[in-house]
């Protein structure tokens, strides 16, 4: 964000505000990788677009799409993978649109059909390391609906241990306590 925007910004708990002039992008990335940083970081700079391009250049970009799917009972489709609650999502195939990928991934990961794609809810970014490469994953999140009444079937070869329908109350009481911050943000926008 620019200095003018930063002057009006109130940082939430665990968010650190840094100046681009005080640390290089590489130093910032090393700090994030070491785990010795705040939960969130806001970078103040004169040219946010240029800073973003420099940040993205440090990673291999991966693009994914997923959905917040509601059934006819207004329950939300969730998955449990690698010890966390999550939403179904996955990488785009070559020449596939984010919306088409979201529908395909939900169907593959949960065995649910009759999906209707709704509007784009949110776009998130998160980083991880895979085979010693730094990955920046951009995920498009869509609102979706289904009339499929079948019980979800988890895609075990994707390490999905469970796929189930939760009420909004269950999402707030169970899901939110054990999920990723970016996924929680997506669901909060959808509820």
Can you annotate each of these PLM segments?
Residues 1-34:
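N-terminal leader/capping segments at the start of a protein or of a new domain
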Residues 7-18, 70-107, 112:
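Conserved Nudix-box catalytic region and its N-terminal flanking loop in Nudix hydrolases
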Residues 22-66:
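Acidic, metal-coordinating catalytic segment for phosphate/diphosphate chemistry
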Residues 60-65, 80-82, 137-139:
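Short connector loops at helix/strand junctions that flank enzyme active sites
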Residues 66, 75, 162:
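Conserved beta-strand and immediately adjacent loop positions that scaffold enzyme active sites
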Residues 69-72, 144-146:
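Active-site beta-strand termini and strand-to-loop segments that position acidic
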Residues 92-181:
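Unchanged
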Residues 182-191:
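Charged phosphate-binding loop/patch that engages nucleotide di/tri-phosphates or the phosphate backbone
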């Amino acid at each position: 964000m620019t200095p003018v925007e930063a002057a009006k910004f109130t940082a939430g708990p665990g968010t650190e505000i840094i100046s681009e002039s005080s640390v290089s992008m590489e130093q910032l990335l090393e700090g994030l990788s070491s785990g010795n940083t705040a939960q969130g970081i806001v970078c103040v700079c004169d040219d946010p677009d240029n800073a973003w391009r420099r940040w993205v250049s440090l990673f291999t970009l991966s693009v994914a799409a997923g959905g917040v799917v509601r059934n006819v009972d207004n329950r939300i489709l969730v998955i449990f993978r690698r010890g966390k609650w999550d939403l179904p999502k996955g990488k785009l195939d070559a020449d596939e649109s984010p919306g088409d990928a979201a529908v395909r991934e939900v169907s593959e990961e949960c065995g649910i059909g009759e999906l209707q794609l709704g509007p784009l809810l949110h776009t998130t970014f998160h980083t991880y390391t895979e085979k010693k490469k730094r990955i920046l994953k951009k995920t498009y999140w869509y609102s979706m609906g289904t009339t499929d009444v079948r019980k979800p079937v988890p895609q075990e070869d994707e390490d999905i241990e469970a796929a189930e329908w939760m009420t909004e109350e269950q999402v707030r009481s169970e899901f939110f306590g054990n999920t990723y911050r970016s996924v929680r943000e997506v669901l909060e926008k959808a509820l």
